[in-house]
Amino acid sequence: MSHRDTLFSAPIARLGDWTFDERVAEVFPDMIQRSVPGYSNIISMISMLAERFVQPGTQVYDLGCSLGAATLSVRRNIHHDNCKIIAIDNSPAMIERCRRHIDAYKAPTPVDVIEGDIRDIAIENASMVVLNFTLQFLEPSERQALLDKIYQGLNPGGALVLSEKFSFEDAKVGELLFNMHHDFKRANGYSELEISQKRSMLENVMLTDSVETHKARLHKAGFEHSELWFQCFNFGSLVALKAEDAV
């Protein structure tokens, strides 16, 4: 059962950097719903994308799976035989709960839940890959290599779903959407102290990119088509397609 996120409701003397530890994992469903505008829409639409792109006899990768929300969404709309989902996260606390969540919902498509580093996982025979608010936690210098690996592991006609928090090249727009995001969190019951403390912990570990930067990386990796398909304030999701005639 998910608990309400009150992790930052009292002053913390030494904040440190953000980690996806046991305390975060325990309140994560509540935290992400109250912090990420449009999160439920993205999860629901990932299921629709899976129905369109997952092919028989292929694999789906959920890289940075957290508690498995995207994995479960994908699995609901897989109607082919011999498919498998591989869900990976480097947080032991997240993986422990993810396994419980996956096991609670029976379905014919098997799921391998792996505790590991997504940079070390081989991507093979993939028809769909999901990076749901994950890339932003990698060092910027490591992001291109991961996208290159995903492109190489995708079958022709495959899709990558890349959801992220965005920065903006237009400072005025960036400021507006930043403030609207904070209004969203206030409306969901977070205090100024909670918002400030969480932001301080995240600022050194979550480094955001613009949509233009994401699209440039995807093009460099080999994706012929990529576009923003969902956005709410400074959060959104892109889909990148590998050409059906790609070698």
From Swiss-Prot:
It comes from the Bacteria. GO terms for molecular function: carboxyl- or carbamoyltransferase activity; S-adenosyl-L-methionine binding. S-adenosyl-L-methionine binds at Y39, G64, C65, S66, D89, N90, D117, I118, N132, R199. Belongs to the class I-like SAM-binding methyltransferase superfamily. Cx-SAM synthase family. It is an enzyme of class 2 (transferase). Homodimer. The keyword Phosphoprotein does not apply. This is Carboxy-S-adenosyl-L-methionine synthase. The lineage of its organism: Bacteria, Pseudomonadati, Pseudomonadota, Gammaproteobacteria, Enterobacterales. Keywords: S-adenosyl-L-methionine, Transferase. It comes from Shigella boydii serotype 18 (strain CDC 3083-94 / BS512). The keyword S-adenosyl-L-methionine applies. It catalyses: prephenate + S-adenosyl-L-methionine = carboxy-S-adenosyl-L-methionine + 3-phenylpyruvate + H2O. Catalyzes the conversion of S-adenosyl-L-methionine (SAM) to carboxy-S-adenosyl-L-methionine (Cx-SAM). Pfam families: Methyltransf_25.
